[in-house]
Amino acid sequence: MNIHTPGLELTPDRDEAQAALDVLRQWAKQATPAEISELDPSVARLVPGMDGVEYPALSREYPSDFSLDDGYKETLPDLQNGPSSLIRGTKQQIQHVGISNFRLPIRFHTRSGGDITLETSVTGSVSLEADKKGINMSRIMRSFYKHAEETFSFEVIEAALDAYINDLESFDARIQMRFSFPMKVDSLRSGLSGYQYYDIALELVDQGGVRKKIMHLDYVYSSTCPCSLELSEHARATRGQLATPHSQRSVARISVEVENDGQCLWFEDLIEACRRAVPTETQVMVKREDEQAFAELNAANPIFVEDAARLFCEQLHSDTRIGDFRVIASHQESLHSHDAVSVLMEGETFKSESLDPKLFNTLFHVG
């Protein structure tokens, strides 16, 4: 049987490889087991039903003395950088491909001039073009680790983003860093103080050549229902009936675009803006005099969820370091078996036709 293989110097495509496999199997139907056994074992295994072909004996011990060299590394398969013929499904651009929640200690500046090291969860992703199979995700981690010893700011995050855009040859990219930021808070009357922890995320987005710096903050506060407060006072005034208004732990997720004007928006600045908007922040260290003061503070600042969104909005509007923003508030009702929620958006950055079905479920903060 004469088999002509013109063009072997060319790289065969998938159809040509399938045709070659069909030829091999046609030959195997008339070949003897001895002839097949003379084939390279990796080729012989492509022939169905040939029990005489034995799988090569493999070592089951870890080769601790194996030495890796550049030549061997060159032979390692790299499926993610393979040809577009390996793509499964539709050849479509993917907006975000990457890794989520890899953790490491990161050093951050504080407004007082010191540094603080915090356990940080990092998510990094890039866009993937329609004709590319995939990305080498470890490159995102490696690029980030090159900057891990620096004290982080948005400028350092930009350098890390540049590194993995170049490494992965992508157009769009994103880094998000989540951590819990401690800030000492004074009690209302007792003179005690303790650390309040704030969930913060920094996000740098590069899309279509436009970069945006975004800061997210979860602010936890007590909300006393204004309607319930008035009804309680009505019962006392008209019937001499003791009644208490309902209040509940509430959470606002504040997301702001940080303007590129050279002025730093410190974590502490955004936290204090939230306190000015809604002063009934949950307390850390509490004695009896603090508990009484907190009851008085709530009575002086009753608030519906609509009020909360607009009060936060007022503070964000007044800060020139802040561009677009979004406020998501959730009052986790003690009267109702459901929550009261509101979403307020300013500008194009956070606008969306749809909300994540689990969005409000992420606003629960347990003690």
Swiss-Prot record:
Pathway: Cofactor biosynthesis; 7,8-dihydroneopterin triphosphate biosynthesis; 7,8-dihydroneopterin triphosphate from GTP: step 1/1. GO terms for biological process: tetrahydrofolate biosynthetic process. The keyword Cell cycle does not apply. The record marks 225 as: May be catalytically important. Coiled coil: none annotated. Keywords: Hydrolase. The keyword Protein biosynthesis does not apply. It is an enzyme of class 3 (hydrolase). InterPro entries: GTP_cyclohydrolase_FolE2, GTP_cyclohydrolase_FolE2/MptA. It holds the Pfam family GCHY-1. GO terms for molecular function: GTP cyclohydrolase I activity. It catalyses: GTP + H2O = 7,8-dihydroneopterin 3'-triphosphate + formate + H(+). Its EC number is 3.5.4.16. PANTHER family: GTP CYCLOHYDROLASE MPTA. Belongs to the GTP cyclohydrolase IV family. Converts GTP to 7,8-dihydroneopterin triphosphate. HAMAP family: GTP_cyclohydrol_B (MF_01527_B). NCBIfam families: PRK13674.1-1. This is GTP cyclohydrolase FolE2.
